[in-house]
Amino acid sequence: MAVTEEEKKRNSTVEISGLRFTYPGIDGHPPPGSKPLIEDFSITLNSSDRCLLVGSNGAGKTTILKILGGKHMVEPHMVRVLGRSAFHDTGLTSSGDLCYLGGEWRRDVAFAGFEVPIQMDISAEKMIFGVAGIDPQRRDELIKVLDIDISWRLHKVSDGQRRRVQICMGLLKPFKVLLLDEITVDLDVLARADLLKFLRKECEERGATIIYATHIFDGLEDWPTHIVYVANGKLQLALPMEKVKETSKKSLMRTVESWLRKERDEERKRRKERKANGLPEFETRTEESRVTGDPARMLNNGWAAGRLHSTVAGGEDNFVLSSNRVLR
C-alpha cells in the first residue's frame, strides 16, 4: 500500500518548509533590500535516507547545513529536525541526536570544555578517549574503520590523519541525523571508502539520516538514496536516486557536471546581457546598513546582535520575545 504524504510527514526526520535566510551585516542586521541567500527551499527526508547535497561553490550548501545544525536562527516552523526546532531545541545537539561536522569544526574541536586546535601537541588517544560517556565498542569500531594509531601526536601527522581523528571524535555518539560538509577532502581512497561504508551501515541498521555535501564523487555512485541540487540558494531538484538514474544514463559525476555546466552557461549569459545594457557584469551587494523593528525580523530571521544567551525561557514559543536570536 502506498505511503500517503501525511504519513511521510509524520515519519520525517528532516523537514525544511519554505526556508528563507539572509546573512546580517556587521551590526547584526541584514542590509535593507539585500537578496536572500536561501529562498523558498523545501525538502523532507525520512529515517535511513542518505542524501547527497550538490551545487557549485557559493550555491548555499554550507549555509543550509548550518541552519539544519542549529547554527543560524530561522523561524521555528521553517526547519524541523526530529520534529523539533533545530535552533531553539539545544537538546538536539547536546544529546548527540543531531550531529554537524564541517566548517569551523574542521579547524578546532571541543576537548575538555575548551576549543583546542587540532594541530597541537597532543595524542590521538587523549583526544578520542577524552570524550566521556561513549560506548567502548563503538569507539573501537571507529578507530578500526578510520585506521587510527592512537599513539599519533597530532602536531606531527598529516592533515589526512588529523582529519581521521576529528571524524572519529565527531561520530563517537550514535546520531539520528548527521550533517557532513565536505569532511572527506583530506582522506585517502581507503579511508574514504571505509568511512562511507560505515555511514551506510549506520543508516541501514540504525535508521539514521545523513545529508552529505561534497564535490568528490568517487565511490558515491550507489551510496546516496536521494540527491538534492541547489543553485543560487534555490532548490533545483530533490529526487530519489532511482529517479535520477531513470532520466540520466550518465554516471553520477557526469550527471552533476551537466547540471552545473548548464547553470554556469545561463549565468554567463545573464552577465553578458547586463554588460550589454550598461550595467555592472556582477550584481553589487548592499552592506553596512541597518534596519530595525518588525521589518528587521522579517528580513533577518529574528537576529539580535551581541546576545549570547536567552533571557526568556520557553524555547520556540517565545520566539518573538526571546533574546536567543543570534549566530551560534
From Swiss-Prot:
It is found in: Cytoplasm. It holds the Pfam family ABC_tran. GO terms for molecular function: ATP binding; ATP hydrolysis activity. Residues 263-295 are annotated as: Disordered. Induction: By sucrose. GO terms for cellular component: cytoplasm. Gene3D superfamilies: P-loop containing nucleotide triphosphate hydrolases. It comes from the Eukaryota. The keyword Cytoplasm applies. Keywords: ATP-binding, Cytoplasm, Nucleotide-binding, Transport. InterPro entries: AAA+_ATPase, ABC_transporter-like_ATP-bd, P-loop_NTPase. Its main location: cytoplasm. ATP binds at G55, S56, N57, G58, A59, G60, K61, T62. The keyword Repeat does not apply. Residues 282-291 have a biased composition (Basic and acidic residues). Residues 14-257 form the ABC transporter domain. Belongs to the ABC transporter superfamily. ABCI family. This is ABC transporter I family member 20. It comes from Arabidopsis thaliana. The lineage of its organism: Eukaryota, Viridiplantae, Streptophyta, Embryophyta, Tracheophyta. The gene is ABCI20.
